[in-house]
Regions:
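ATP-binding glycine-rich loop module of kinase domains
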Residues: 17-18, 24-73
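Conserved structural core of kinase catalytic domains
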Residues: 63, 67-125
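Conserved hydrophobic alpha-helix
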Residues: 131-135
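Conserved protein kinase catalytic/activation segment
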Residues: 149-166
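C-lobe/activation-segment region of protein kinase-like
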Residues: 169-263
Length: 264
């Protein structure tokens, strides 16, 4: 009976998560501006209402993240682009952020490409994890570190020299949460959004590879707690990021628990 209840709760969270995922706060388009290609990103007119409504929702779901209002979002984008790329971004008079165009394709797009060879898949995942670890070492966390939010440029030199660029910094972690928790939440988001685009027989290997590349057992221990039980309020938000099956969720938890003795 408890197993049936757990599956029912999981399905409910999955359905609500899909609804949450349909919400959009902004739009972005690439334009030619002053002889250069730029990304113009603007908030949708109803975004302030969504953000206001979301404040209560994120507390109820215990997500540990929030979507930033306009001014805080602008400041965060400016700070991160300056830190990562040594470049400034402009704010147009109509509250449009003008960002540089970053090279590459999203990791999500690459992993969904049936023509992409296994070595390139592995290198793309590795580049994303390495870039996330470097981002964390700079003192930042992402807040929505999905495969959809990292660009992989495998053409940036030889295969071993491919580059990855994280983008879309509208979401921020609750600063009251421990740093290990915030980093683990980013790693979780990247792992699950990669695994849902990986064939089942390769998921265990891919999970192990990503954790080995990130190489922080303290973060792995915190990450494991996200998969100990389905009875977590944050599950709805997590399934909004990646629509895992009940079996996949359980399998990830089993693999993480099996890995935990390595830290002893």
């Amino acid at each position: 009976m408890r197993e049936l209840a757990a599956r029912g709760y999981f399905v409910l969270c999955l359905a609500v998560g899909r609804f949450l995922r349909s919400a959009r706060y902004s739009t972005a388009r690439v334009v030619d501006q002053d002889g250069e290609r730029r990304v113009r990103k603007r908030r949708l007119f109803y975004a302030p209402l969504l953000i206001w409504m979301g404040r209560l929702l994120v507390r109820i779901l215990d997500t540990g993240v929030r979507v930033l209002p306009q001014r805080e979002w602008e400041e965060r984008e400016r700070l991160i682009y300056r830190s990562l790329h040594g470049t400034s971004i402009r704010l147009d008079a109509d509250n449009v952020l003008v960002l540089p165009v970053l090279a590459g394709r999203t990791l999500a797009t690459l992993l969904e490409d049936p023509e992409l060879g296994e070595s390139f898949r592995k290198k793309a995942i590795e580049r994303a994890v390495v870039a996330l670890a470097e981002f964390h070492r700079l003192g930042f966390t992402h807040g929505d570190a999905m495969a959809e939010n990292v660009l992989i440029d495998l053409a940036a030199g030889p295969l071993d020299a491919g580059a990855a660029h994280w983008f879309d910094f509208e979401t921020v972690h609750d600063s009251r949460r421990p740093m290990a928790w915030r980093r683990a939440d980013d790693v979780r988001a990247l792992i699950v959004t990669s695994l849902v685009r990986t064939v089942p027989e390769k998921r265990a290997e891919t999970l192990e590879f990503m954790l080995d590349v990130y190489a922080d057992e303290d973060v792995t221990r915190v990450l494991t707690t996200s998969f100990t039980s389905v009875w977590r309020r944050s599950l709805t938000f997590h399934l909004a990021q990646a629509a895992l099956s009940f079996q996949c969720f359980r399998e990830i938890g089993r693999l993480l628990r099996a890995r935990s003795p390595r830290s002893s």
